[in-house]
Structure formats: C-alpha cells, structure tokens
C-alpha cells in the first residue's frame, strides 16, 4: 500500500478528491459501473477503504461528481459552438450537436448510467 498521509488543508483535500475522481473514472471506463466498488477504488489508489471514506461516502457520490463534470464540459462545448446565437438553422443545429457529442464521447454513457443509478437507488 502506498504511503498515505491524510490531507489536512483544503488544497490537499482537493488534491485527494481529484485523485479519487481520476481513479474512479479509470475504473468506470474499464468495465461496468456496477462492478466497481469503493474497495476497487481504494485499491486503485493504493489506499485502505477507511482512508477513502475520509473523503467520500458512496460510489454514487463519486459517480455523480464525475457526471456533473462531464455534463458541464458538454454544455460549455455547446455554448461555445452556439457562440451566443439564438436563431440557428436546423442543419447547423444538428451539426453543432453532433460535433459536441463527438468531442464528449463519454457524456452519453454517463448520462445513461445516471438515469439507471437514480432509478435503482432512489425509492419514490
């Protein structure tokens, strides 16, 4: 196991969260979301699960943070392509959306998973 030193400052905590996000994203991209566990994430980081729990409570929390990051990147891409224009011809509209998806290939996967996760983990 890697030498683990608990982050104390806000800056170090942000670095730890970024490490968690990167490791989780790698694991989510390599296989099924449902096959990834906090144990797998901790192992990928070289940490114990107890150390991981100091920063996150659930796998869903990590996933939703990644999803929001992907969503923000996708929306920013769309806004950049629209460049403040409101009246865009249909053909250009389709082209803008197609290019935005091409530049953000992971976003649709995360969006689909997000709906599945919410349906599975939220009771009405």
Region spans (language model):
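N-terminal intrinsically disordered/low-complexity leader segments
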Residues: 1-15
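Generic hydrophobic, amphipathic alpha-helix propensity
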Residues: 13-24, 41, 66-70, 74
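Helix-turn-helix
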Residues: 19, 27, 33-61, 65
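Long, hydrophobic, well-ordered secondary-structure blocks that form the structural core
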Residues: 54, 64-75, 80-84
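Short, solvent-exposed secondary-structure capping/transition elements
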Residues: 61, 75, 109-110
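Hydrophobic alpha-helical connector segments
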Residues: 65, 80-107
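Amphipathic alpha-helical segments used for helix-helix packing
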Residues: 103-123
């Amino acid at each position: 196991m890697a030498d683990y030193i608990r982050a104390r400052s806000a800056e170090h905590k942000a670095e730890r969260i970024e490490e968690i996000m990167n490791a989780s994203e790698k694991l989510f991209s390599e296989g099924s979301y449902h096959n990834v566990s906090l144990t797998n994430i901790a192992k990928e980081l070289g940490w114990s699960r107890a150390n991981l729990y100091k920063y996150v409570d659930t796998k869903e929390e990590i996933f939703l943070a990644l999803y929001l990051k992907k969503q923000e990147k996708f929306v920013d891409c769309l806004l950049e392509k629209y460049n403040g224009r409101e009246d865009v011809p249909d053909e250009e509209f389709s082209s803008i959306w197609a290019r935005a998806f091409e530049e953000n290939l992971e976003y649709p996967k995360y969006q689909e998973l997000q709906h599945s996760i919410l349906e599975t983990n939220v009771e009405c």
